[in-house]
From Swiss-Prot:
Receptor for neuropeptide Y and peptide YY. It holds the Pfam family 7tm_1. The gene is NPY1R. Glycans are attached at N2, N11, N17. The modification Phosphoserine is found at S368. One of its GO terms (molecular function) is peptide YY receptor activity. InterPro entries: GPCR_Rhodpsn, GPCR_Rhodpsn_7TM, NPY1_rcpt, NPY_rcpt. Residues 1-44, 98-116, 176-211, 282-299 are extracellular. It is a multi-pass membrane protein. GO terms for biological process: adenylate cyclase-inhibiting G protein-coupled receptor signaling pathway; feeding behavior; G protein-coupled receptor signaling pathway, coupled to cyclic nucleotide second messenger; glucose metabolic process; locomotory behavior; outflow tract morphogenesis; regulation of blood pressure; regulation of multicellular organism growth. Gene3D superfamilies: Rhodopsin 7-helix transmembrane proteins. This is Neuropeptide Y receptor type 1. Disulfide bonds join C113-C198. Residues 66-76, 138-154, 233-260, 321-384 are cytoplasmic.
């Protein structure tokens, strides 16, 4: 899912635009193959909006969490890691990919040729596995509240492991990414004189296909299946818990809270899958048979798929932060340039659970009326 994301731009341009057949190259000189200015302008606005929202949204989340010491729990530590990786994607992935795809030649130098896809692959791997760690933390918080629960130290260790894995899985881009003018050497058109392309040059097509297939599993299908399983189990547990609580407390409040949580859980999984699905399909098709994709429609189709995937950098802060009332409140202070004030008694302590984390099936049966009343009172303040 990397050639998928990064080298795909390079490879698409090289293999599609500069094949051994001059007809393909000449096709790009045909006016019918150039994107209309109106389309380029629209895409530029869309990419600009995603970059601005992705950078500002994730930066705001990072600052708000780091500013508040009482917010440095496992969930928020993982959210900061997620936001940081999304921030890198918004900075390193969107502008370079957009410019290179439109220009069909590389203008950012040899060092950036190697660094750009490497950083992009690292960032996306970190982002996706941050979602996995958050799913694990939610799972333990709700499914097994009396069992093993990750603490801050576990979160930091998990983040370190993610970054090591991301760097290791991205090393082929540092090794095989090259900047060359070879595709233009036999071209007599002045427009392509002194032009370079940046793409991966694996030892063979089988090596490239093996690597891109591995990334496809590592960066999409594997994490998506795992996240879906975790949130499905959470959904089932919350539904059962809701049925138990309906017998002992106000049904209207409990039903609305459960509905809200279920929608959030569904939205998290759907947003992740939907944002990345078009680019995943596009890259899979291109990797195995790039001739299926029409030369003239290639760049536009890729940019649309890529833009859809990059929207995930804006969606994540909304789901993991701005739907939380604490973040909404602190965001007002953030944009008003006011000091952040500590509000320990005011802060939510549970992001997805409708019950206190110590309340399980067993504890519900054993709780005394007085204790249960206290739990209810506390629970009213622990909303998403």
């Amino acid at each position: 899912m990397n050639s998928t994301l990064f080298s795909q731009v390079e490879n698409h341009s090289v293999h599609s635009n500069f094949s051994e057949k001059n007809a393909q190259l000449l096709a790009f000189e045909n006016d019918d193959c150039h994107l209309p200015l109106a389309m380029i302008f629209t895409l530029a606005l869309a990419y600009g909006a995603v970059i601005i929202l992705g950078v500002s949204g994730n930066l705001a989340l990072i600052i708000i969490i780091l500013k508040q010491k009482e917010m440095r729990n496992v969930t928020n530590i993982l959210i900061v890691n997620l936001s940081f990786s999304d921030l890198l994607v918004a900075i390193m992935c969107l502008p370079f990919t957009f410019v290179y795809t439109l220009m069909d030649h590389w203008v950012f130098g040899e060092a950036m040729c190697k660094l750009n896809p490497f950083v992009q692959c690292v960032s996306i791997t970190v982002s996706i596995f941050s979602l996995v760690l958050i799913a694990v933390e939610r799972h333990q918080l709700i499914i097994n509240p009396r069992g093993w629960r990750p603490n801050n130290r576990h979160a930091y260790v998990g983040i370190a492991v993610i970054w090591v894995l991301a760097v290791a899985s991205s090393l082929p881009f540092l090794i095989y990414q090259v900047m060359t003018d070879e595709p233009f050497q036999n071209v007599t058109l002045d427009a392509y004189k002194d032009k370079y392309v940046c793409f991966d040059q694996f030892p063979s097509d089988s090596h490239r296909l093996s690597y891109t297939t591995l990334l496809l599993v590592l960066q999409y299908f594997g994490p998506l299946c795992f996240i879906f399983i975790c949130y499905f189990k959470i959904y089932i547990r919350l539904k059962r818990r809701n049925n138990m609580m309906d017998k002992m407390r106000d049904n209207k409040y409990r039903s609305s809270e459960t509905k809200r949580i279920n929608i959030m859980l569904l939205s998290i999984v759907v947003a992740f899958a939907v944002c990345w699905l078009p680019l995943t399909i596009f890259n899979t098709v291109f990797d195995w048979n790039h001739q299926i994709i029409a030369t003239c429609n290639h760049n536009l189709l890729f940019l649309l798929c890529h833009l859809t995937a990059m929207i995930s950098t804006c969606v994540n802060p909304i789901f993991y932060g701005f739907l939380n009332k604490n973040f909404q409140r602190d965001l007002q202070f953030f944009f008003n340039f006011c000091d952040f004030r500590s509000r320990d008694d005011d802060y939510e302590t549970i992001a997805m659970s409708t019950m206190h984390t110590d309340v399980s099936k067993t504890s519900l049966k054993q709780a005394s009326p007085v204790a249960f009343k206290k739990i209810n009172n506390n629970d009213d303040n622990e909303k998403i």
